[in-house]
Amino acid sequence: MSQLVCQRCGKCCNDLVQQDRGVLRGLSLMPEEVHLFPEELVKPYLGIGKRPHMDKFQIIAYQLVSDSCPHLVDNSCSRYDERPTSCRQFPFSLDLDEENEPLLGVDMNCPAAVELINNTDGLLEFTDRDDAERLLELKRRVLENPRRAWVYDLATMKWVRFDKMG
């Protein structure tokens, strides 16, 4: 079974703020990971509820607003053992296919992923699948009721209802 060997290029820790379906968003953070970053670098990301300003509105994920991770030092993570879920799963990710079944994605901007895919025996070791499953669960919650799911747009600093996104 082939295993990913990080090449410490730092590409995964830069260009973290991207356009996604018409909104500008940063690296996803689980609520318990917010403390890993300075408060001014974290904003809400996903919320569930009728309206963001209402009492029962629940923020289910946050996002890093910095384009580069502040923990990247000499192309290495200075907080590797406690890095966020999004970082743990990288360069792999899980998404949902047409039948709502998990589909494995691989970020081919990662040189280690390219090397792994080019030299694989057909089986990949996905050691942090549990982390990818946690992020996939957020997607499932959003897709269960897209009219009650909201995404915080970093460009406008406003909430956008998920079903209204591009």
Residue map of PLM features:
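Short loop/turn segments that flank or connect secondary-structure elements
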Residues: 1-166
